[in-house]
């Protein structure tokens, strides 16, 4: 038996060697063909280059050909000889992602399985139920956080706090938000069975929900702040954003708007063409808005307004912050460069790069950084230089160059858009952050209180005027205390760090009584802290309750009355002389 086994082994090895030789031969043949193809490509690319640059270009193209050939040969060997069978999509996908990660954060690869993700990003559309979900620690499951108005989740009767028990019979206990979200999404028109547990009810609820095309609202709210000042909240630039803004501007003007507050805070950008179309409403036809400059000639473009505007003289204030980026920076930066509006708030993010979506073989896609953009003054506001190999360099203030607006005001490139009027937002205490942010409060005290409140109050006052009463807040406060709500107090953390340093430097023993006294003073007194921060906690609690009755639009409308930056913008728009002086040369605040 042993001899037969050895003979069988030899036979199998001979077959394996022949297969391996055949694979190596095929690999060698493929590599030779690839090499010839790459050399031809390199030659063609060189021929298209001016003579004085041909030597450098030829060397570059040859190096590209060599590296591609090396990569192809390397993976062929891995596939042929590695001890375990490789998943080509995963292994090569990781290689691609590592390569792109060394460039900039915006150049990304999307395999066929992730093409829907790119489409959602570009259009703001996806197939689903239209609801924000959050993970509930106490239930160890995801819950409905915020159903969007008039979308499947809301029309099916889902409410804030509903626990997602199962989807099409699959148990969702312990599953995180990405997993549950992926199962809630799907092709529009498809249906699924959802089982939920509603707080306060013992019996589970089952419902059949049909997915629809969900368009996340790029303009969740607009309205009149005063008799003459309009307000528009624009949260992203996706397909149709300009159409929404146009409708809002026209409607607000019909209702008496004489000046506008355009809120671009936390707007991460999106479509450049949508930004140009929005600016077209406020500047004359034929105005140059933005130029893009890249490596290829076709990346060099100039975008001008092509339609008649709605209003070129109405005062406009653009509210911005550190999360205002890309297309929203083109919008506020152009308003600043053309002295068409005042920019208020804090410095913007500083993204002056343009991405182009490209199709790849086998239904894969990529989003590729192809150009820098330059707003009307000629400046690029990119704040970070990506130097390859994952290295970043923030543009130093000393290297930022001066440019001039239409009226001669000095503005700078690099580092984002500096506001004409700097207004810091109200600071957010840690206790409020922990109470309101999903995933930080293990007691879920705010969500549970809101769900209970809504179950006991069929209706509330209009969104703009509703406010939690003192009695309601006292009930919330007692619930937080009874439920054992805790949060990370920065003062305690800093004191612990200080004690460590004092021990290391040998001062702790001498100051021990003082340290212990300070520790005692800083111990949690939750009741006192909830009283001290009552006003701002009430604001967040009120907003959460309002969203259950009037959805996202109502929550925004309610919050505006407490917004320090909005108040300052209204004050400015009520003062025409100050507004005009800011847009005069060298007049900034």
Model-derived segments and spans:
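A structural signal for short loop-to-beta-strand junctions that line the ligand-binding cleft
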Residues: 129, 308, 369
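Cleft-lining beta-strand/loop regions that shape enzyme active-site pockets
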Residues: 37, 52-67, 71-88, 111, ...
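Extended, small/polar residue-biased N-terminal targeting/export presequences
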Residues: 79-143, 191-211, 216-221, 560-570, ...
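Conserved functional hotspot residues or short segments at active or partner-binding sites
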Residues: 380-589
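Bacterial Sec-dependent N-terminal signal peptides
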Residues: 1-8, 15-61
């Amino acid at each position: 038996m042993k001899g037969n086994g050895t003979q069988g082994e030899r036979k199998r090895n001979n077959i394996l060697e022949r297969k391996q030789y055949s694979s190596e031969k095929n690999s060698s043949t493929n590599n030779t063909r690839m090499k010839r193809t790459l050399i031809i490509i390199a030659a063609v690319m060189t021929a298209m280059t001016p003579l004085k640059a041909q030597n450098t270009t030829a060397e570059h193209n040859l190096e590209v050909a060599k590296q591609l050939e090396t990569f192809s040969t390397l993976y062929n060997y891995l596939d042929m000889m590695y001890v375990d069978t490789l998943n080509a999509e995963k292994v090569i996908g990781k290689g691609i992602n590592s390569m792109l990660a060394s460039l900039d954060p915006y150049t990304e690869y999307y395999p066929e399985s992730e093409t829907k993700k790119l489409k959602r990003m570009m259009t703001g559309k996806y197939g689903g139920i239209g609801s924000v979900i959050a993970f509930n620690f106490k239930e160890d499951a995801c819950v409905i956080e915020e159903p969007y108005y008039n979308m499947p989740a809301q029309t099916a009767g889902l409410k804030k706090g509903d626990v997602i028990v199962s989807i099409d019979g699959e148990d969702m206990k312990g599953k995180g938000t990405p997993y549950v979200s992926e199962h809630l999404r799907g092709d529009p028109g498809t249906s699924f069975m959802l089982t939920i547990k509603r707080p306060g009810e013992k019996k589970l609820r089952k419902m059949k929900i049909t997915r629809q095309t969900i368009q996340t609202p790029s303009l969740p709210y607009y309205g009149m702040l005063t008799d003459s000042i309009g307000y528009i909240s624009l949260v992203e630039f996706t397909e149709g954003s300009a159409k929404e803004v146009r409708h809002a501007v026209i409607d607000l003007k019909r209702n008496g708007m004489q000046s506008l507050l355009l809120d671009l805070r936390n707007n991460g950008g999106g479509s450049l063409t949508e930004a140009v179309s929005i600016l077209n409403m406020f500047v004359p036809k034929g105005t140059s808005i933005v130029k893009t400059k890249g490596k290829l000639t076709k990346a060099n473009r100039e975008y001008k307004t092509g339609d008649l505007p709605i209003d070129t003289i109405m005062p406009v204030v653009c509210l911005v912050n550190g999360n205002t980026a890309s297309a929203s920076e083109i919008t506020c930066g152009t308003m600043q460069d053309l002295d068409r509006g005042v920019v208020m708030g804090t410095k913007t993010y500083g993204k002056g790069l343009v991405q182009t979506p490209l199709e790849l073989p086998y239904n894969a896609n990529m989003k590729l950084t192809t150009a820098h953009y330059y707003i009307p003054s000629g400046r690029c506001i990119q704040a970070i230089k990506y130097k390859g190999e994952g290295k970043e360099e923030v543009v130093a203030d000393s290297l930022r160059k001066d440019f001039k607006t239409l009226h001669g005001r000095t503005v700078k490139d690099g580092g984002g858009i500096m506001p004409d009027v700097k207004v810091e937002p109200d600071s957010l205490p840690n206790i409020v952050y922990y109470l309101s942010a999903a995933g930080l409060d293990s007691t879920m005290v705010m969500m549970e209180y809101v769900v209970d409140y809504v179950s006991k109050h069929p209706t509330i006052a209009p969104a703009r005027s509703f406010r939690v009463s003192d009695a309601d807040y006292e009930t919330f406060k007692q619930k937080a205390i009874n439920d054992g709500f805790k949060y990370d107090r920065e003062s305690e953390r800093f004191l612990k760090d200080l004690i460590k340093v004092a021990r290391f430097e040998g001062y702790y023993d001498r100051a021990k009584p003082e340290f212990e006294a300070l520790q005692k003073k800083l111990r949690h007194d939750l009741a006192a802290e909830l009283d001290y921060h009552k006003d701002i906690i009430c604001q967040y609690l009120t907003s959460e309750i309002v969203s259950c009755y009037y959805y996202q639009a109502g929550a925004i409308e309610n919050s505006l009355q407490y917004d320090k930056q909005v108040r300052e913008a209204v004050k400015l728009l009520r003062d025409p002389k100050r507004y005009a002086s800011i847009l005069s040369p060298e007049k900034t605040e």
